[in-house]
Amino acid sequence: LITHASQTDDMATRIPDSHGVYMVPAFVGLGAPHWDPDSRGLICGLTLGSTQAHIARAMLESVAYQTYDLIRAMREDGAMRTSILRIDGGMAVNDWFAQFLSSMLKAEVERPVNIETTALGAAFLAGLQVGLWKNLDEVAATWKQERVFAPKMDPAQRRIMIDGWHDAVRRTLTPPAPVAQPTAGVTSIRAA
């Protein structure tokens, strides 16, 4: 479908929507909040009009939907509410994705100047250990914002898309094991 991740931004913006295509990337099952190690990946909603761009966009959308599900689960578990999410890593350079994520979360999404913060975090820990920084406040002061994305999507459209995602996820979940039935030779006890 694509040869490099950088192509996905152009593919996602070339079309107005995913045309009802959803991708559930359950290649090794689903983790939180679904906890189904036996579920399998799924692409659904394909039609004769579906293109590579629709599938690529559905892939990007799936990351935002998974983030939505995780944050919702954290809030239901009593986690502190926040109106800002900071992103990093390779997908963070994709403006379309960052905007979509912001709309799905109904929260601002902040992208740092340096998107490779995983490696930077290891460097910060080493620097703290040798005394380069005195405390975490000094480390936090080094973070620089490159751009902020604010939610833009119509709430009704957002709800339709999230409901479509949850329908797709339900299709991947392993059905519960059947309830064991009494075996031959076992009698039931009846009240007289």
Predicted feature locations:
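Active-site core segments that coordinate phosphate-bearing ligands/cofactors
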Residues: 1-192
